[in-house]
Design a protein with these regions (language model features):
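Sec-dependent bacterial lipoprotein signal peptides
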Residues: 1-22
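A structural "domain/chain start" motif
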Residues: 22-92, 201-226
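Surface-exposed short loop/turn segments
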Residues: 24-42, 105-156, 172, 220-226
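Soluble periplasmic/extracytoplasmic beta-strand elements of cell-envelope proteins
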Residues: 52-57, 70, 124-130, 144-150, ...
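Short secondary-structure boundary motifs at beta->alpha junctions and helix caps
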Residues: 77-87, 155-196
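Structured, soluble extracytoplasmic/luminal domains of envelope-associated proteins
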Residues: 84-106
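Sec-exported extracytoplasmic/periplasmic mature domains
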Residues: 99, 103-107, 195-199, 203
Length: 226
C-alpha cells in the first residue's frame, strides 16, 4: 500500500468531524505479537533434558528498534507508520514469546532470563532480529520476519544449534491486524522448527536415543510460508 492509500485507509476507517474548518486526528493503534504455544507438539523426546538454558534478550537491527511498525514497498526503502505502533519494544516482545514457548515445550529442566535468578545455566540461547515488517507489493501484502538464533554451551562457547530464518506469509485480507496475526504465526513456526532442531542437538549432547522418526529439518527456513 503506498503512503497516499495508507493515509486514505486510516482516515477512511475513522469518522472525520469538521468543526470550524478543523479535522479530527486519527488515534494511534497499538499492537503486539501473540500466540498460544502448544505443549509437546514439536518435541521428539517427551522428557525435558537435564540442563538449564539462559535466554538472553534478543538483539534487533537498528532500523527496527523503534515503536513504529515498519512497512516497505521495495527492498531499498523502509517506511514507518505513525498511526500503528508496537505496544512493547519489538526485541522484548519477541524474547518474551520465545521464553513462553520454551517453558511450554518442556525442552529443558529450566529456563532463566538472568544468571542470578535460578540454577546456574548450562547453555545460552541468543537471537538477532534482522527484519520485522509488512511488505506491500502493489496489490499483495506480506508479513515478513527474519531472525537468527544460536544455542551455545556456556562453559566453552561451542555452538550446538544455529539457524537463520527469513520468512514471509501472504496477508489475503488487507487489514493491519491481519498483518500482525500472520507475523505471530511466522514466529510460532520459527519456534516450532527451532525447538525440534534443538531437541535433536540436545539428545546427541546427552546420548539420548530419539524415537524412530525423521530427525532432519525438512521444513523451509526461507521463502514464503502458506
Amino acid at each position: 500500500m503506498n503512503p497516499v492509500k495508507r493515509l486514505l485507509y486510516v482516515f477512511g476507517a475513522l469518522p472525520i468531524i469538521v468543526f470550524a474548518g478543523c479535522g479530527s486526528v486519527p488515534l494511534k493503534q497499538y499492537y503486539t505479537l501473540n500466540y498460544l504455544p502448544s505443549s509437546q507438539r514439536e518435541r521428539l523426546n517427551s522428557n525435558a533434558y537435564p540442563c538449564v538454558v539462559r535466554l538472553r534478550d534478543f538483539n534487533i537491527e537498528e532500523a527496527y528498534d523503534r515503536p513504529q511498525i515498519v512497512y516497505r514497498q521495495s527492498p531499498f526503502q523502509l517506511q514507518y507508520d505513525y498511526y500503528r505502533a508496537w505496544a512493547v519494544k519489538p526485541a522484548r516482545m519477541i524474547t518474551d514469546l520465545v521464553y513462553k514457548h520454551l517453558l511450554t515445550a518442556n525442552l529443558v529442566s529450566g529456563v532463566v532470563r538472568r544468571f542470578d535468578e535460578g540454577p546456574r545455566p548450562d547453555f545460552e540461547l541468543s537471537g538477532m532480529i534482522e527484519a520485522l515488517d509488512e511488505y506491500d507489493s502493489r496489490e499483495l501484502w506480506f508479513a515478513h520476519i527474519a531472525l537468527r538464533m544460536t544455542l551455545s554451551r556456556i562453559s566453552d562457547g561451542s555452538v550446538l544449534f544455529e539457524k537463520r530464518f527469513d520468512l514471509r506469509k501472504r496477508v489475503y485480507e488487507h487489514k493491519p491486524e491481519n498483518v500482525i496475526r500472520e507475523l505471530s504465526s511466522l514466529l510460532e513456526y520459527i519456534m516450532i522448527q527451532s525447538v525440534r532442531d534443538m531437541d535433536v542437538r540436545l539428545a546427541k549432547e546427552y546420548g539420548i536415543a530419539l524415537p524412530q522418526a525423521d530427525t532432519s529439518s525438512s521444513s523451509p527456513a526461507t521463502g514464503e510460508i502458506r
